[in-house]
Amino acid sequence: MVNENKKRVAKNTMMLYLRMLFYMAVSLYTSRVVLQTLGIEDFGIFNVVGGVLSMLGFLNASLTGSTSRFITFALGKNDYSLLRKTFAGTSNLHFGLAIFIVVIAETIGLWFLNTQLIIPENRIVAANWIYQASIISAFIGIAQMPYSSIIVAHEKMNIYAYMGILEVSLKLLIVYLLIISPFDKLISYSFLYASVSVLINFMYAFYCHKNFSECRHKLFWDREFYKELLTFSGWTLYSTLSWMFKGQGVNMLLNIFFGPVVNAARSIAFQVNSAVKSFISNFSTAFNPQITKLYAAGEYTELYQSIIQYSKISFLLLFFLTLPIFCLLYTSDA
């Protein structure tokens, strides 16, 4: 059993790393081409407008962690009725949250976009189109999040990897379409980008409905169930708020004080930073379901051994990744 789990984690990690390497290579390339095609100012506008909606996404980030944990826990207990209830309940919460965020985005968010951000007057209309495309993408993305959690809980990392590779391949196609587009390139890019996001999310939902019988929607009210889920989400709310202010909050301040050109520079640096962090997050995605399932099954000895082993591997992965960077900084100072 232990060896099987180790082999599964190793295989899943390999699949996620292949996904990440492909994703990183294509993303860095497309960022450069999109920057050249849109221009510095429009590129900055695209990122800062999308950032307004990302600031509202901290609620989704905290709820997503709880969704993944509760679905994996139910799967680890081999309790099918609990699994179906958990999926249906988390789907209801995510759909309600998606509607709530759309309402806030179309009121407070829209006011903030048009009155507080520094956007050239001749690009205000384009910025509003970007914003609406981002709202569509965000609504679909939030509503489908339980499907992603189901795939990870079942440790179908190959599907997760294939979807990621397909997504970046479509984004690569977007770059070509953007270059030849006769329309406003900023508006075209925002809707093409949103279309890819919507398509991938629908493919996640289609796969889950076809392969996992627990993926069935049902409206129900269970006060204790929702209370437990939301209470667990509250513990992650503080960290997601901090990351949100550190990321998109700084982006908003840079725009207000320095304009969209500085946003363009930071967005490129932010993408490189995210690519580096994805090395460890991919490994965590591979072993987190195992940890939760072992805890749910009451196999504590194997649980502790796995935690120690995975912690060592995480440290080594991060060490070998950052060592060349520290060496480069040290030699450049010398």
Segments from the language model and where they lie:
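Interhelical loop/hinge segments that connect adjacent transmembrane helices in multipass membrane
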Residues: 1-9, 186-190, 204-247, 290-305
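Signature of the first transmembrane helix
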Residues: 8-73, 102-106, 172, 231-261
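Hydrophobic alpha-helical transmembrane segments
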Residues: 19, 132, 161-177, 181-210, ...
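Alpha-helical transmembrane segments of polytopic membrane transporters and translocases
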Residues: 44-60, 89-93, 192, 199, ...
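Helix-loop junctions and terminal segments of transmembrane helices
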Residues: 61-77, 153, 212-213, 269, ...
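Alpha-helical transmembrane segments of multi-pass membrane proteins
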Residues: 107-111, 120-144, 161, 165, ...
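Membrane-interface junctions at transmembrane-helix termini in multi-pass inner-membrane proteins
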Residues: 139-166, 176, 187
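Conserved small/polar residues in nucleotide/adenosyl-binding loops
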Residues: 330-334
